[in-house]
Amino acid sequence: RQFGAWYPWYAVIVLTLAATISAIDRQVLALMIGPVKRDLQISDTQMGLLLGAAFATLHTLASFPMARLADRYSRKWIIAGGIFCWSLLTAASALAHRYSTLFLARMGVGVSEASLPPAAYSMMSDYFSQKQLPLAVGIFQSATFFGVGFASFVGGPLIQHLEMQPALVVPIVGDMYPWQAAFLVVGLPGVLVAVLAA
């Protein structure tokens, strides 16, 4: 299949944005361990399960069927749908007032984020020659490190700023903890990336 000279690199930019958002969504919870434990009154073990099993186990298991789907159906729509789902689920974590609700949301994020790597690598292998492919893959893979670094650099001050603000009251939802507001801030921009990927 032939592509315009610009389109493959546009795809790499969008995929890299998606991978960056994915890394930020994964990392943000680790920056809010104290407030989440305090407000949900959960133990270290429960927090460890949120950070590990809730996301990693489902992410790993979902990678296999996601790869199968990427072979059979439109990779563009699989990626866009995955970004949309994990972004909404990250934002929906802002509504969690119970441990079980947050646990389920993180499970959903893990499953949704499993859609990106297999579809992205398959897409890039079609878009680029063997000579160009390593550069495209390298750019895409750098997103994880950039996302983690960005989350640490910006997320800490953001959460500290939110902690200093008066209680946030959202219509229908009610009072919102600062860490819940942080989930909204990092989750909603991903919806725009999903639109770019579609």
List each model region and its residues:
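Helix-loop-helix hairpin linking two adjacent transmembrane segments in secondary transporters
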Residues: 140-198
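Residue-level signature of mid-helix packing/kink "hotspots" within the transmembrane helices
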Residues: 27, 55-64, 114, 148-149
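Cytoplasmic helix-loop-helix junction between adjacent transmembrane helices
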Residues: 104-144
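Conserved MFS/SLC helix-loop-helix module at the cytosolic interface between two early adjacent transmembrane helices
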Residues: 61-100
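Cytosolic juxtamembrane N-terminal segment immediately preceding the first transmembrane helix
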Residues: 1-24
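Helix-breaking motifs and short loop linkers at transmembrane-helix boundaries and internal kinks
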Residues: 41, 74, 95-101, 112, ...
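Membrane-interface helix termini in secondary transporters
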Residues: 35, 67-68, 157
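Extracellular/periplasmic helix-loop-helix junction of adjacent transmembrane segments
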Residues: 30-61
